Amino acid sequence: MDTTVRNIIVTLALIAGLLSGAAAAADLPRPPTDKDRCAVCGMYVHKYPNWIATIVFEDGSQVFFDGPKDFFRYALEPQKFKAKGRKVAKLFVTDYYGVKFVDATTAYFVAGSDVMGPMGPELIPLRNREEAETFARDHGGGEVLAFDDVTPAKIPR
């Protein structure tokens, strides 16, 4: 193969890789600033990067939470927070092990573990069931919950 053709192919492959990485990054929410507060309790969320959760609305606006339990309080009862009727585009929580945003609807949550969040007992978010079950065994977690299994009664107080 001619060197010029090979260089063109390599360049195109690199551009495709960069574009796919940029598209993946574009799907993630913006990180909170030092002014963003939890939409439920009012805490400054940037102080707790390992616990941040966020809801992104279709208009591009976001609300942040200092942990999954406040995230679920808001998501399950939006009328309490004057959010009823707002159209949700994406839901994110911070994966406990990876400390990166993951899609909340595909994450698993461990209730009743010995790990505390910024405000005490917390639902611990993990990116998949296997990691959630391992975490529950290692940290005395009582129950592994899929996103749709979290109800107001299962949110720690």
Locate the predicted segments by residue:
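Thiol/selenol-based redox catalytic cores and closely related redox-interacting motifs
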Residues: K84-F147, A153
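N-terminal secretory signal peptides
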Residues: A26-K84
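N-terminal secretory signal peptides that target proteins for export/translocation
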Residues: M1-R6
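Short hydrophobic/aromatic segments of transmembrane alpha-helices and their interfaces
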Residues: N7-I8, A53-T54, D114-V115
